[in-house]
């Protein structure tokens, strides 16, 4: 058999060519858009290169599911970064929300949460994310007011800014967002009155939770136009009439208004047949308990304690299944499970 001896110099040249070809093949096969990768690496830098993002490496593909919290659009096969989860980052010192987020124009979902060292206001750069549907900034020390510029992101479906250090007043302009389904602003320092415009959210809007803030004034009469499945305005300083939140023609499932100074005749409100949770404790609500409560077969949570209610607790439904504490400390409420009326 004839043998061929390849010179050493030729063998070395072939090895170099092979390495180059493999490198070119790898580069060509990378799905991550180079602009998206550059933006992500800048975000990492702007946050002080936290060790939690150690998987974000310039030599790897950001769309191969090895980059923590990063997902790309595989449905349309554009492979643009459309989902970013920045939760639980161990930032080495306080940092603001990076304005470089604006360089991810295809983001549909942005979650920023559980970061004690995240501080400062919500940056105007967020308004450039014109395809954003879901925006979560929660359990951080982000401060300042909820910005008006959010009304520019017409695609927004969900806004969750719960448990931060946000202050100022509620921005009236977000009620113009045509696709907004719900807002969650619990656990901040938001003050002032609820804007009248919040009664003009679109028919898609079904959830409003703004508990544990410093809201004052009255619930706008325009809320009669809303059909909320979930409403939680508890632990504020609201006063006056909250009957506009009730109605037999609504699809309301939960109403939580505890620990305010609300005063209205509970006996005159209509009740949604879907109501499963009602927390009205620690207010100034008067009148009687509506007979309609006995017809609510889904009602599993009720607390009307520490109000000015009177009369006999209606018999039937689930009302006698609740503990005495659910009815305690009213003006003259009586009947099972409280002592009998005299």
Curated annotation (Swiss-Prot):
Q: Where's it mainly located?
A: secreted
* Entry-linked InterPro entries: Leu-rich_rpt (IPR001611), LRR_dom_sf (IPR032675), LRR_N_plant-typ (IPR013210), PGIP (IPR051848)
Q: Which GO terms describe its cellular component?
A: extracellular region; membrane
Q: In which compartments does the protein localize?
A: Secreted, Cell wall; Membrane
Q: Which domain of life is it from?
A: Eukaryota
Membrane-topology descriptor: Peripheral membrane protein
Provide a GO biological process annotation. defense response
Q: What is the effect of changing residue 326 to S?
A: No effect. No effect. Loss of activity
Q: How is it modified after translation?
A: Asn-303 is not glycosylated.
Signal peptide bounds: 1-29
* Keyword Magnesium in annotation: no
Disulfide bonds listed in the record: 32-62, 63-72, 310-332, 334-341
Q: Which Pfam families match?
A: LRR_1, LRRNT_2
LRR repeat ranges per the UniProt record: 82-107, 108-132, 133-156, 157-180, 181-205, 206-228, 229-252, 253-275, 276-299, 300-319
What keyword terms does UniProt attach to this protein?
Cell wall, Disulfide bond, Glycoprotein, Leucine-rich repeat, Membrane, Plant defense, Repeat, Secreted, Signal
Q: Which residues are glycosylated?
A: 64, 141, 303
Q: Does the keyword Mitochondrion apply?
A: no
Q: Which family does it belong to?
A: Belongs to the polygalacturonase-inhibiting protein family.
Function comment: Inhibitor of fungal polygalacturonase. It is an important factor for plant resistance to phytopathogenic fungi. Inhibits all polygalacturonases (PG) tested, with the exception of PG from F.oxysporum which was only inhibited at 60%.
Write down what this protein is called.
Answer: Polygalacturonase inhibitor 2
Source organism of this protein record: Phaseolus vulgaris (Kidney bean)
